[in-house]
A protein has these predicted regions:
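Conserved GTP-binding G-domain of TRAFAC-class P-loop NTPases and closely related GTPase folds
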Residues: 88-173
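A contiguous binding-surface segment within folded domains or other stable secondary-structure elements
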Residues: 66-95
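A broad, low-specificity signal for short, low-complexity segments enriched in glycine/proline
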Residues: 8-13, 33-38, 87-92
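Conserved nucleotide-binding/hydrolysis micro-motifs of P-loop NTPases
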Residues: 55-56, 79-84, 134-136
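Nucleotide-state-sensitive switch-loop elements of NTP-binding domains
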Residues: 1-32
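Glycine-rich phosphate-binding loop used to anchor ATP phosphates in small-molecule kinases
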Residues: 21-77, 113
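Generic signal for short, ordered secondary-structure residues
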Residues: 13, 20, 45, 69, ...
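Alpha-helix N-cap/loop-to-helix boundary motif
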Residues: 51, 55, 82, 102-105, ...
Length: 173
C-alpha cells in the first residue's frame, strides 16, 4: 500500500504517525483475517457484522462493498455529547483490557463519525440511534432511521445534543 493510499484511508494521521502506527492500524482495521472472513461471508451470502467508528474511508468502503453485493445495511450509532465523554469511554475500555487510541484519533472519530453517518445515511436500510451518555449510565435507544424517516421512541422524552446534526430528516413520533 502506498503512502498516498494510507493517507486517504487514515486522513487523521500525519506521515510520522502512520510510520509509528502502521502495524497497529493494519492489525486493528484491515488485517488479512478480517478480509478473509468478510470475503467468505460474501461468497456464501452470510450475515456479517462490522464495528467501525465510520470516521474514515474504511467503514464507508466496507458499507459500499456490502451494499454492492446486495446486503441490507443495518447500523447502530452510539453517540456521545462531548469529546470528553468519548475520551472517558476509551479510558474505560483500556482499563478492561481493550485497545487504546491516541487523543488525536478520539477527537477525529468524534467529529467525523457523525459527519460521515449524516452524509451517507441513505446507505443504511435501517439505523438505530443510541445515546451512550457516560460510562456511569446505561445507553438508550431513542430513534431509528428507515427510508428517509426518523422515528422516535415514545419512551424517551428528549433527544441528545449530538443528534442535532440529523435535524433535517422527516420525523415520526
Amino acid at each position: 500500500m502506498t503512502s498516498e493510499q494510507l493517507k486517504q484511508m487514515y486522513p487523521m494521521y500525519t506521515a510520522d504517525m502512520l510510520d509509528d502506527l502502521f502495524e497497529k492500524l493494519v492489525d486493528d482495521y484491515k488485517s488479512k483475517e478480517y478480509a478473509k472472513c468478510r470475503d467468505i461471508c460474501i461468497k456464501n451470502n452470510l450475515n456479517f457484522a462490522l464495528e467501525t467508528p465510520f470516521a474514515d474511508n474504511f467503514g464507508l468502503d466496507e458499507v459500499l462493498l456490502f451494499k454492492k453485493k446486495g446486503y441490507s445495511i443495518n447500523g447502530i450509532l452510539f453517540g456521545l455529547n462531548t469529546v470528553e465523554e468519548s475520551i472517558a469511554n476509551v479510558a474505560l475500555r483500556v482499563q478492561k483490557k481493550g485497545h487504546d487510541l491516541l487523543l488525536e484519533s478520539i477527537r477525529w472519530n468524534f467529529k467525523h463519525s457523525y459527519l460521515n453517518v449524516y452524509n451517507h445515511i441513505n446507505l443504511f436500510d435501517q439505523l438505530h440511534f443510541v445515546h451512550a451518555q457516560s460510562v456511569a449510565e446505561n445507553p438508550f435507544l431513542f430513534a431509528s432511521y428507515s427510508e428517509g424517516i426518523i422515528n422516535f421512541s415514545s419512551s424517551q422524552p428528549s433527544v441528545p445534543l449530538w443528534f442535532s446534526l440529523f435535524a433535517q430528516y422527516s420525523y415520526k413520533t
